[in-house]
Each structure stands twice: as C-alpha cells, then as structure tokens.
Amino acid sequence: MNLKQEVESRKTFAIISHPDAGKTTLTEKLLYFSGAIREAGTVKGKKTGKFATSDWMKVEQERGISVTSSVMQFDYDDYKINILDTPGHEDFSEDTYRTLMAVDSAVMVIDCAKGIEPQTLKLFKVCKMRGIPIFTFINKLDRVGKEPFELLDEIEETLNIETYPMNWPIGMGQSFFGIIDRKSKTIEPFRDEENILHLNDDFELEEDHAITNDSDFEQAIEELMLVEEAGEAFDNDALLSGDLTPVFFGSALANFGVQNFLNAYVDFAPMPNARQTKEDVEVSPFDDSFSGFIFKIQANMDPKHRDRIAFMRVVSGAFERGMDVTLQRTNKKQKITRSTSFMADDKETVNHAVAGDIIGLYDTGNYQIGDTLVGGKQTYSFQDLPQFTPEIFMKVSAKNVMKQKHFHKGIEQLVQEGAIQYYKTLHTNQIILGAVGQLQFEVFEHRMKNEYNVDVVMEPVGRKIARWIENEDQITDKMNTSRSILVKDRYDDLVFLFENEFATRWFEEKFPEIKLYSLL
C-alpha cells in the first residue's frame, strides 16, 4: 500500500456530548463491533469492577466520568480508525477543545429525552468554527424521550445546521420496535428474536408481520414518508463543509444501531485534512515529508513507571520509529525511538504511522502542548492550540514541607498536561493555580495524592478574572492594587488577577496606557 492509499484509509474523529448522554458507552460499543475488545462492559458497572475501556484513570473509574481525552485505534473493514473519547464535564472543556484540533470529524451524542444540552452546544460551536463534519447519534431510544421530528427541529434551530435522518425509529421506550434504514429500506428489530423485515418502494411491508397493525409502525411510516416527500437528497459536500449532519437513532447501551452508524461513518467521513501553518502554508496529508503536532500531554498513564506521554497527530508524510525530527520551538533535532499506540491504558509500540494517526511519544520533559515536529528540512510550525482563561484561582502548597520535591514535580507535570494553569507571585513565589471549574481542582488534589503521594492545601485567592498584558514594559509596582495581584504564568508572561469586573474596569480607566487581553 502506498502513502496515498494509507492516508485515504484513515478516519480520525472525536465523540462529543453533555455528561451522561452515552458518549463513553458508544465508544465501548464501537470498539466491540470492530473486534478491538471482546466484551462491551457497562460504563457504570462500578460494583462489578468493570470500567469503560476509555476511562483508564483511577479518578475516572471511581466517579464514572471522563476527565481526560482517551485515544484508541482500531481496524474496521479496510479502514484504520482513530477515536478520541473526550471529557464530557464542562470543567475539562479546554482539553476537549484541544482534542478537536486533532480530528477530522466529530460524533455528537444526544440523549433522546434531553435533546441539546449546554455542553453539547458549546462543543458543537467549536466544531462549527473549525468546519468539522459532524455525525449525530441520538441515543437511548429504548427509553421514553422526545419525538423524532422534535429532536431534528431542535438540532436545526439550536445548532443552525441541516439534518438528514439516515434511519427512523419505530416507537420508543418499552414499545421501541426498531429502526427503519432509509437506504436499504429494511427494518432492524430491537429484540434479537425478531428477523430483519423489508419494505418495498412504497414503504409497504413485504413480509406478513403483526407489526403492520401497530400504531407505532403506522406513525413511523407516515413520518418517514413525510421526510421522503421533502425530497432532499443526502448532500455529501454539505456534510464535509459542516453544514449538514447525518442523524442516526439507536441505543448504545443495548448495542443497537451502533453498527449501522459505524458502517455509514466509514463510508461518508472525510480522510485526513490538510493543515494550515503560522506561515500561511497549507500542508497536504500526502506530502512526503513528515510533520505532526502535540495536542495533549498525559502523565502517569502507567503509575508504576511515572511516565509522560505526548500525544501527536501526524499531519503529513510517514512517521517511522527511530527517525530524526526537529522540534520547531527549540530548533533541536531528536531521534524518536519510543512511540506507542493506545487502547486507553494498553500500549503497543508503533513503528509506522501516517497522516490522521494519533501516536504517543515518551516525553522526558521536552514537549509542550502545541509543539510542531517536522522531518527533513521543513521549517514551518502549525498554528497554536487554544488556551482558556481560568475563572477560579487557588493558592496551593504541600501539607508536609518534607514533600516539596514531589509537590513541585507533580505540579510541573500536571501543568504541562494542560490539566490546570500555573501562576507565581512576583516577590513571594507563592504558587497559584487557575481552572475553568471546581472539578479541575478536585481532580488535581486527587491525582497529587494518588500519583505523587502529596497531600495539598488549597485556599481561594478571591480573584476571578485573569488578564494578560500586551505592553509589559510599562508595568510598574504601583499598579498592583488591593483588588488585583500581579503574577507570572508558566511562560513568565505577566498576568493581572482581578477581584471582579468592577476592579478590572477601574484598572483600565486608571491606567489606559496598559493594554489588557484575555484568552478564550
């Protein structure tokens, strides 16, 4: 297989949703249907000791939530699929945001009873902004929920995107019979004891079956005929531009509708895209010269070895283990001898990868999120990955002063992961951590104790707003007021932490010559 054929066989996507919509369950079932795992265990099965394949971190297994982005690769038909299961909890939107920079499409999971929820909306907007094609899986049809047309209208009106239902449900909840596949005109029954049924071109059942007298069946056929009469053909170009989403109905927990979705996904999802550089150069996935970027760093995937893995998206060319690459930020050459692929925490050495693949590089502290790696004589760097402005700030210290070495090591690694943001006061070197939400601090505290054996003391700073400074050379000590703290971030850039909006406006009016700005 040549490079072009290899690249065309790659499909790389992220799964996005609000917490509890069934995102991680869908991930498990996709792995199950691909043969990557033998048993699709239930995500919530804490009492049985079974945890989702993608929820590998101890805190995730205990709480049943995804707080990091897991990466898994599997083969299906003639395709190699890279799937990223992202954090559903809003406090970890920064990690999710960066993950969405590394994929070529996204799958949006919606709970049929709840419809579009706040976190789904937020993540959808990121996909829309990037023009990422979005596939929609409406989940939990075996429970009572909103009517199909109501859900489609909600998606179209709330998200401003056209919908195209690929299948249609017959009933829901206890009366859920199955789904009608529009393309094959077949009915796939929900219960195993039922056989697949066939419809003719007029949507009449070809077999004798009691369901013809069922009101749910009659309603489903009427609704589907309305959809067909609208006469809109599936527009693949609109999908690829992010203007149309194909919609699939099913139940991930019951393994129903998942394989239909997977079959359609590999048919319609895009192959790896070209990427833009800071130098305004478009890098084609078919370029012979290797390039990639780091979008995530994860410490302690193997707690026994205190390892650090940098997750790299291959953008162009072929990666070969042992090859020499240049880290563009430092302009230093390095030989990559340790590279890995993933099934959550199960790792396997990677000798070869092409555009679209996600691989892990063992990191001794060389890499930062957003780093560009290139082979040959290339000199470009890919565009920076986004960083969120924190909204909560805490002073942090080690409870036991004898644990300072472990304390600083833990903070250094967790900050480099992008799990939390780091600041230091100018004169006292007091460490202040910033986060988007409270759960980030809870996970930080948990990981410091479990992974670094350090109990930490955290104390609110009483500051809510962070503003960076364009013209740092004009900052003086007199600008540090009782309602603000001047600190440095991990890159040694000056940052003001303000008490509230009023304090921010007061500062801007008193010192108009200082140009403040926020991150995302």
Curated annotation (Swiss-Prot):
SS bond list: none
Location(s) in or outside the cell: Cytoplasm
SUPFAM superfamilies recorded: EF-G C-terminal domain-like, P-loop containing nucleoside triphosphate hydrolases, Translation proteins
Domain tr-type G, residue spans: 8-277
Sorted UniProt keywords: Cytoplasm, GTP-binding, Nucleotide-binding, Protein biosynthesis
Keyword Transmembrane helix in annotation: no
Protein origin, superkingdom: Bacteria
GO MF assignments: GTP binding; GTPase activity; translation release factor activity, codon nonspecific; translation release factor activity, codon specific
GO BP annotations, alphabetical order: regulation of translational termination; translational termination
GO cellular component terms, semicolon-separated: cytosol
UniProt binding sites for GTP: 17-24, 85-89, 139-142
InterPro entries, sorted: EF-G-like_DII, EFG_III/V, G_TR_CS, P-loop_NTPase, PrfC, RF3_C, RF3_dom_3_sf, RF3_GTP-bd
Pfam family, any one: EF-G_D2
Family classification: Belongs to the TRAFAC class translation factor GTPase superfamily. Classic translation factor GTPase family. PrfC subfamily.
Its job: Increases the formation of ribosomal termination complexes and stimulates activities of RF-1 and RF-2. It binds guanine nucleotides and has strong preference for UGA stop codons. It may interact directly with the ribosome. The stimulation of RF-1 and RF-2 is significantly reduced by GTP and GDP, but not by GMP.
Cross-referenced NCBIfam families: prfC, PRK00741.1, small_GTP
Name the UniProt record assigns to this protein: Peptide chain release factor 3
Organism: Staphylococcus aureus (strain NCTC 8325 / PS 47)
Gene: prfC
